[in-house]
Every structure is written in C-alpha cells, then in structure tokens.
C-alpha cells in the first residue's frame, strides 16, 4: 500500500534539507544569483516560527520531496500582517508522482492563513510551466488578483553565467 503523503511543519533540524531544496529551487527558477546567507535567514525564521512557518513533504534527515516557506509580514504600505509565500517548490523527481504535492502545499498555506486569521499572498514568478501552475492556483485559491512581468531576463537564466562554486563563494 502506498504511504499517505502529508505536509508537516518544519523544525530547526530541517535546516540542511531545506537549504538543499532551496538552492535547487533557485537554480531552476531563481531570477538572480541566490545569496545562501539570505536564504538561510528566511528559512531559519520559518523553521523557528519567527514570523514564519515552513511546510515540508518528506521525513527528517532525508531529501525533501517538496516544501513551502511562508512569512508573516506587513505589506509595504501597512502595519497589518499578511502571510506571504516566499517559495513553493516540488523537487523534479516528484512532480509527476501521485499524491498532488503542490496541491497539498497550497492547502497547508490556506490552513496557516485561516489559523492566523490573516490574508495569504501567494503567486507564481516563473518562466516555465506557467499555465499548469495557474490552473492549480485557480482551483486552490479562486480567481487571480494580478500578474507579474519580467523584463530583460527569464527565471533560471542566471545559472547560465554562473558556476556552482560562484553561488557558494561570492557571499
């Protein structure tokens, strides 16, 4: 029998697995060269629940299948908190697997928003496989509220001009 796929709340012990997944997400879909220190700062805040939370699909001390990073912060023009999605990422090895991992991460985000009683701001900033992501988000969240445009680059392009060593040594 297949094991049920669930999203668990991340803990500080998940930091290495989250960093690995985050760097993979940045390599595939980041707009610019990632700063591992900034990634760690955001991830650590979510793992320690300091104005954030992380949802993870995968067991501790293994390679994670998928994750979502959410941060509670005000919009730039307000003091009221919103729950802002920093990243949703399903590892490529699990995208076509049964279980609807992206859907489960969306449900995790909605539950967090409802429990905190603050609005969720979530979106798609990608140059690849956009239409399928839009359909998923419309099913999960209803009609969209805006859109993004990127001028001058595509997500993931920074990798073409960077070596793996650059990512880890430039910071």
Question: How should these model regions be labeled?
Answer:
Residues 74-85, 144:
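A conserved beta-turn-beta hairpin within the catalytic core of GNAT-like acetyltransferases
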Residues 96-111:
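Conserved acetyl-CoA-binding loop-helix of GNAT-fold acetyltransferases
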Residues 63-73:
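Conserved beta-strand in the GNAT
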Residues 86-99:
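A short, internal acetyl-CoA/4′-phosphopantetheine-binding micro-motif in the GNAT/acyltransferase core
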């Amino acid at each position: 029998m297949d094991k049920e796929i669930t999203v668990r709340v991340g803990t500080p012990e998940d930091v290495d697995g989250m960093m690995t997944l985050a760097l993979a997400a940045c390599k595939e879909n980041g707009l610019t060269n990632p700063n591992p220190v900034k990634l760690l700062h955001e991830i650590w805040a979510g793992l320690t629940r300091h104005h954030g939370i992380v949802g993870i699909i995968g067991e501790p001390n293994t390679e994670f299948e998928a994750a979502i990073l959410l941060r509670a912060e005000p919009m730039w023009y307000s003091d009221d908190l919103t729950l802002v999605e920093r990243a949703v990422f399903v590892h490529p090895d699990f995208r076509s697997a049964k279980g609807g991992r992206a859907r489960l991460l969306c449900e995790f985000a909605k539950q967090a928003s409802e429990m905190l009683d603050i609005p969720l701001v979530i979106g798609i900033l990608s140059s690849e496989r956009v239409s399928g992501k839009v359909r998923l988000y419309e099913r999960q969240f209803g009609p969209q509220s805006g859109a993004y445009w990127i001028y001058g680059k595509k997500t993931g392009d920074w990798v073409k001009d960077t070596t793996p060593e650059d990512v880890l040594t430039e910071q």
